[in-house]
Amino acid sequence: MQTSHYAAEKDMQDAVPRLTFTLRDEERLMMKIGVFVPIGNNGWLISTHAPQYMPTFELNKAIVQKAEHYHFDFALSMIKLRGFGGKTEFWDHNLESFTLMAGLAAVTSRIQIYATAATLTLPPAIVARMAATIDSISGGRFGVNLVTGWQKPEYEQMGIWPGDDYFSRRYDYLTEYVQVLRDLWGSGKSDFKGDFFTMNDCRVSPQPSVPMKVICAGQSDAGMAFSAQYADFNFCFGKGVNTPTAFAPTAARMKQAAEQTGRDVGSYVLFMVIADETDDAARAKWEHYKAGADEEALSWLTEQSQKDTRSGTDTNVRQMADPTSAVNINMGTLVGSYASVARMLDEVASVPGAEGVLLTFDDFLSGIETFGERIQPLMQCRAHLPALTQEVA
């Protein structure tokens, strides 16, 4: 089975056209790079053969400081309140997003910092105040990722799951949520009245020093409509292995949704990088990780993905649970030599609407270093970066 997957993946890679950029293209293709920090144990590989580690502040500090050194543009942490179990206890051990990113804001100076709000757990007025605080810590480098929540057991364990009708109304809920945030970040006062929230002369001060960026990760039609109206950019999954432009239809849908609102909302695409000196060496790593897939944890993911029967078939969780490459929750995966990965990332940048990528690595510390030293210098879409001037531990 692995051999046939390999052949199919290679065929897909060979089918991707090699791009030759003009100067005009290079000016357009200045792509942002971010790191999706491992706030949960073992990062994004659900495998007994992958590096096994616990999330700590010190680990994430080292990762984000190294990313800042190599001119990454932003760092994002997710929020996860219950894991998948299995032999690897995948994501059973997690830090909290806002407090982690507040700490990271204090030990960095340039990189943009994003925390994720699980909006069912936090009233918008509290998120508004926490965000304003981290804005102060970071000197205006903070933004908020808003998620509606899809894994029912995360919220049932606390007695706050609103019922399965929420699946079909979650973006109505989020729309009210962000309107309250906008009031409080803008004027410091909200009297919003809606189906989900009632504000009575609610106050938050001080306000953020700069306009607060809001991001989202909707791939359903409802999610994209929300992002088109309220988000500064929208995350989406890359697709396949070594098929760097396969997400293009998703980016096109986001562009079309944004055109309806008259706003510019680009796509930032999630990829895992597995790189080595040669294509064969990188491929051997990938096959090794797949061979150790934690089937018990993966079955939990599949079970949870089937609970939402009301949001349609185009949601993020549907892609995460696809058996094709569930070992890394089916994010786009770039496997190859440093030169091959650089070329594929330039191809990502060529897709209309793709303004950035959010990267994970099989091994974060060594992965970011090899990316900064060996991959990024080969990328035409990062040719605008200044030279490195200092060492980082």
Swiss-Prot record:
Its EC number is 1.14.99.46. Induction: Up-regulated by the nitrogen regulatory protein C (NtrC also called GlnG) and repressed by RutR. It holds the Pfam family Bac_luciferase. It catalyses: uracil + FMNH2 + NADH + O2 = (Z)-3-ureidoacrylate + FMN + NAD(+) + H2O + H(+); thymine + FMNH2 + NADH + O2 = (Z)-2-methylureidoacrylate + FMN + NAD(+) + H2O + H(+). One of its GO terms (biological process) is alkanesulfonate catabolic process. It comes from the Bacteria. FMN binds at I79, K80, N145, E154, R170, Y171, S220. SUPFAM superfamilies: Bacterial luciferase-like. Disulfide bonds: none annotated. Keywords: Flavoprotein, FMN, Monooxygenase, NADP, Oxidoreductase. Belongs to the NtaA/SnaA/DszA monooxygenase family. RutA subfamily. PANTHER family: ALKANESULFONATE MONOOXYGENASE, ALKANESULFONATE MONOOXYGENASE-RELATED. The FMN-N(5)-oxide reacts spontaneously with NADH to produce FMN. Requires the flavin reductase RutF to regenerate FMN in vivo. This is Pyrimidine monooxygenase RutA. The lineage of its organism: Bacteria, Pseudomonadati, Pseudomonadota, Gammaproteobacteria, Enterobacterales.
